[in-house]
Amino acid sequence: MTIQDHTKRKIPRLSATRDCHEIWPTVQEHGAVIIKNLLPLEVVQRLNREVDPYVKIEPIPAAETKDHPNRVLSTTTRMINVLADFSKAYREDVLNNETLNKVSTDAFSVYGDYWVLMGAVMELAPTNPAQPLHRDMRFSHPLVDYLKHDAPPTSINLLIALTPFTVENGATHVILGSHKWPDLSGATMEQTVRAVMEPGDAVLITDNTVHCGGADMTGTETRRLLSLTMGISQITPLESNFTVPRPIIESLTPLAQRLVGWRSQRSSVPRDIGLLTIRGKSIENTLGLKSEQPLPDGMEKGSMQETDIGGQ
């Protein structure tokens, strides 16, 4: 395993608009890329406002009140997902983002359709410790370790900065070239480079890229990100959007509906018979699902009502 050539190069940086066609080839070569201005600042600001009340009241991921506690994340981490339920910015601006969908199409073309495996806003409190170096999907989808080492990735993760990412407040560590390693037994923190970013920038990695969240050294700064994991439709998502009210689902574009699992999916194989079908018919046709409909008054927050956030 050769690592010397990858130790201290900087993460490549590309424009979300001007360099869109170069993004996925760059990830294939280096294992990571920083996409500048993936989300406009105005979208970041709206997304932050919409998630603020929910992040503040969400129990820690490892809370024993949860049916499926997440003991991988630190106790100084707050995480809220199923964002389509209450965030208009997520529903309209993130899910329909042209660069996001171009990159996902490029990454998964050999497999077929893709969707969101999880979209979660994570807030890391001051003094949040560094994570261990790891590869994504290993705490939920062990099948990825049984794939051929040179198989195309089945998922990618975009860590989108919603607040500044600095070395001091814990910007993500990445080992360039590690997506080509057979394992991560030789990985060390000394081999990492940092994903320093402004709000709206994103670091894109594959499910084989070795990385970790950094430690906050400021003692005062809270760091927030949108962790957006995209994957092939042949893999079960980590989150379910079945509780999102139908009027909200019908306000989405057909693309966004597919990304949150409310439309049938297709693979790339010849004579594809479809995925998530109902006796050979699609979900959307069976349900008579509409799209891009105006939302009724009072439906912006879906199942997350005012009482759920203490009347805020």
Curated annotation (Swiss-Prot):
Q: Which GO terms describe its molecular function?
A: dioxygenase activity; metal ion binding
Give any single GO term for biological process. Answer: biosynthetic process
- Keywords, A to Z? Dioxygenase, Iron, Metal-binding, Oxidoreductase
Q: Which reaction does it catalyse?
A: (-)-cyclopeptine + 2-oxoglutarate + O2 = (Z)-dehydrocyclopeptine + succinate + CO2 + H2O; (Z)-dehydrocyclopeptine + 2-oxoglutarate + O2 = (-)-cyclopenine + succinate + CO2; (-)-4'-methoxycyclopeptine + 2-oxoglutarate + O2 = (Z)-4'-methoxydehydrocyclopeptine + succinate + CO2 + H2O; (Z)-4'-methoxydehydrocyclopeptine + 2-oxoglutarate + O2 = (-)-4'-methoxycyclopenine + succinate + CO2
Q: Which Pfam families match?
A: PhyH
Disordered: where is this region? Answer: 287-312
The yes or no answer to whether the keyword Oxidoreductase is present is yes
The broad enzyme category this protein falls into is: oxidoreductase
**What EC number(s) has UniProt assigned to this enzyme?**
1.14.11.-
Pathway stated in the Swiss-Prot or TrEMBL entry: Secondary metabolite biosynthesis; Alkaloid biosynthesis; Mycotoxin biosynthesis
Q: Which InterPro entries match?
A: Phytyl_CoA_dOase-like
Q: From which domain of life does this come?
A: Eukaryota
Query: Signal sequence span per UniProt?
Result: none
The cofactor named in the record is: Fe cation
Q: Does the keyword Metal-binding apply?
A: yes
| Ligand binding (Fe cation) | 134, 136, 211
Q: Report the sequence similarity comment from the record.
A: Belongs to the PhyH family.
Q: What is the role of the protein in this entry?
A: Iron/alpha-ketoglutarate-dependent dioxygenase; part of the gene cluster that mediates the biosynthesis of penigequinolones, potent insecticidal alkaloids that contain a highly modified 10-carbon prenyl group. The first stage is catalyzed by the nonribosomal peptide synthetase penN that condenses anthranilic acid and O-methyl-L-tyrosine to produce 4'-methoxycyclopeptin.
Q: What is said about its interaction partners and assembly?
A: Homodimer.
Q: What name appears for this protein in its UniProt entry? A: Iron/alpha-ketoglutarate-dependent dioxygenase penM
Report the source organism: Penicillium thymicola
Q: Which gene encodes it?
A: penM
